[in-house]
């Protein structure tokens, strides 16, 4: 399948640079995945499309302040470090700039010296394995010394870093936010529960690979990045009960979708408590085993994410909806508007 099949024209001014003052004031496009019918709503009206007995599945990952600025021991040269993935113990896969200054054995000091790192291995494209030493608890030190890494298409500085977190974020470990969840407020979640809609949580730590462009002509040849996921006993039990009672499972975000589909694919459609790494790549032709609907933002042309939503709603329906979104001046990408596919 050719990558150009997932291209569309997007004016740059439609890429949202800042979040709206109120999370649930975003626009919501509702797309019927069978008929292709489109409706235009406000996000807080999502409630009218959810039924008693349905289940919304949210990703409770929390974005870590993964960008660090340090100095090379001995020379004092400035080094930028971006944490990508925790390995064993205090070792992390990272991206460093300038990479040529960081070789095996290089030591880097951050802030007042409470955090230090030693390079123990080199990878391609500026990747380095760093081993950290610190005083206290690693994530607390990181909160004080690190900065929030925003997607490359967001050029403006974020006034309030919490706006790049969901209101239910709790499991620290992501390099990027699961952005479909940014539209929910505590009040909206309470209203959803009051209607008899279940809310379940999974965890998938989003890696920067989510922004990596597809560089192959035939999408089947794309090498998908792996991300850590986890499902608890409580969530697995709830999802199996919802399925047995005829409720719909609606994923909030492509990250929740990939977690649910990974687990259901391994267990004949059932949900089981487990953790692991997933590199599932969902594109047209994929048969969904877990979800009935999806809440998601508007994605980049030719991205793996637009391929995923095309698998669920049909490529032609998605491209028609995206063209309508451009015409109606919807806001795109991380801080943009949302789509409900049901």
From Swiss-Prot:
Q: What does this protein do?
A: Transfers and isomerizes the ribose moiety from AdoMet to the 7-aminomethyl group of 7-deazaguanine (preQ1-tRNA) to give epoxyqueuosine (oQ-tRNA).
Instruction: List the GO cellular component terms.
Output: cytoplasm
Cite the PANTHER family for this sequence.
Answer: S-ADENOSYLMETHIONINE:TRNA RIBOSYLTRANSFERASE-ISOMERASE
Instruction: Name the pathway it acts in.
Output: tRNA modification; tRNA-queuosine biosynthesis
Name of the protein this chain belongs to: S-adenosylmethionine:tRNA ribosyltransferase-isomerase
Fetch the SUPFAM superfamilies from UniProt: QueA-like
Name the species this protein comes from: Geobacillus sp. (strain WCH70)
What is this organism's lineage?
Bacteria, Bacillati, Bacillota, Bacilli, Bacillales
Q: Where are the transmembrane segments?
A: none
Keywords on record: Cytoplasm, Queuosine biosynthesis, S-adenosyl-L-methionine, Transferase
* UniProt signal peptide: none
Recorded family membership = Belongs to the QueA family.
Q: What class of enzyme is it?
A: transferase
